[in-house]
Amino acid sequence: MACARAVPPAAPAQTPAPSPVAARAAAAPPVAVPHAVIPAPSSATLAAADSFRVDSTTQVVIDANAPAEVEAVARAVAALVPVATAVPGQPAPPLPAPRRLTAGAAPPARSIYLTLRQDGAAVDVRKDASPTAVAAPASPPAGAEGYALDVTADRVTIAAPQPAGLFYGAQTLRQLLPPAVEHRSALNRRLAVPVGQVADAPRFAWRGFMLDVSRHFLAPADVKRFVDLMALYKLNRLHLHLSDDQGWRLEIKSRPELTRVGGSTQIGGGPGGFYTQAEYADLVRYAAARYVTVVPEFDMPAHTNAALASIPRLNCDGRTPPLYTGIRVGFSALCPDSAETWRFVDDVVREVSALTPGPYFHIGGDEVQKLTHAQYVGFVERAQGIVRRYGKRMIGWSEVATTALDPSSVVQTWIPDSSARHAARGGTIILSPAKRVYLDMKYDSATTLGLRWAGLVDVRTSYDWDPATFMPGVGERSILGVEAPVWSETLVTRQDYEFLVFPRLAAVAEVGWSPQAARGWDGFRARLAQHGPRLQALGVNFYRAPEIPWGQTAAPAAPAPVVPE
């Protein structure tokens, strides 16, 4: 996991959110790039000679029989793409609501057309219907998340086998539009998308981001904001670290003391907080609408002081420890031989599993210093059985790889571990190497937020590695995906989190999505430079990493995305 061994023993003073620092240009000259899409598509050909122009006549259309999920994506596209307005100071209105085509009709000119399609034919999702052939300029790649984006001067077509692919194709279209669409400023000119084709699908199924809301609490609205930013970069797993020594952050109805006591504070002694089950369910729904699966983590048997202070019977001596507001680790553990411990674990897994439609439950399992190895192995294997009883697949940090895991369980590696043994038994691995993707590490020695026990992690360090060759004995077939955690020892406000998360999360998103052959540091840094204005338009408090040529990158070779009237 995070934090641990090399961090100081006392809680740090709360650091005010840093103001965005002045852009610092890298020494390298500007690099011309054909597009600024992140993650890099599997294949993209964009022409400089022509473009599709969005204006007041543009409409979003879907097939007559398109399911509700497709209509939802179409509504998101219509809401995102503004109609140009010539009225200074007024926000640009969205496109009209999408409309359904009549059966058998072709999409009209001047339209953005979303269609479920396989092998060049539109897919009728009704069980009693046969596929309706519609001429297609491109077929989407296979897989639920693949898509094809085809732009002509007359039409934009996004085709995909499943609604998730349409959603990701819409994010690519979004990034081909100018950053001004993000804040809906007055656009007294027409918007243009370069003509060309994109065929794209993810390399890995799991492209994750972890928020530690236990050490410092984040309000539901702040979590939703991170979900929105994840969607922009095609990330699809939100791992919520919901319990630790410093706080318990989700209501458990059978154990109300967990939030009444354990949710009452955080690092530094602040007021803490927690999510009601209704708020958590709302977060899950909000994320699902953006094709993000929520993965809950309740750390056990260590990192449990908030639970031990709430329910003394979970301690082997039955005593109540004080609430903890520092950042040390390893001093707490559930009593592994207590029947009360296992009633508690069952209650938590049962209630949270019922609230979480995704297939995973994360038990933590890291940094256990108070149990013998035999006790630890017994705990993990028994917890695994409870997780399976409630229909979920167990995930645990690196340390669980030393136990007899079921092949359906997943190891999330953060340090060198025994994952190769789990892979040899048919198990899968999530790669979260601390020295590469722990976003709570400082960028450099001058960074005011974050820690450095795993080293300094600049943007290139987060980007420049290949998951398939990273861990001996763990090949690409055994890798479920990659995930970037941000631990919150030094983070108090949403702006603090954003400062350490961006732009490194965009780098990790490309590691997880793009084929290795489509990746390269020089091209990435050039594309990332063009995301500065987009992140600014979204109000993100991102770090102006000096290795990125913010403001220097040459304009795309494709036509300028904003075309005067």
Describe these PLM feature segments.
Residues Q14, P18-F204, P485, D496, ...:
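Contiguous, structured surface segment used for ligand recognition
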Residues A404-P407, I415-E565:
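Flexible, acidic glycine-rich loops studded with aromatic residues
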Residues A136-S332, S338-W342, D347-Y360, R382, ...:
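Feature activates predominantly on carbohydrate-active enzymes
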Residues R207-M210, H239-H241, P296, Y360-H362, ...:
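Structural recognition of the beta-strand scaffold that forms the well-ordered cores
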Residues E340-A423:
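Gly/Pro-rich turn-and-neighbor structural signature
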Residues A68-E69, F217-A219, D245-E251, P301-A307, ...:
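Flexible loop/turn segments at secondary-structure boundaries
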Residues V60, Q162, F209, M230, ...:
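Conserved, mostly hydrophobic/aromatic
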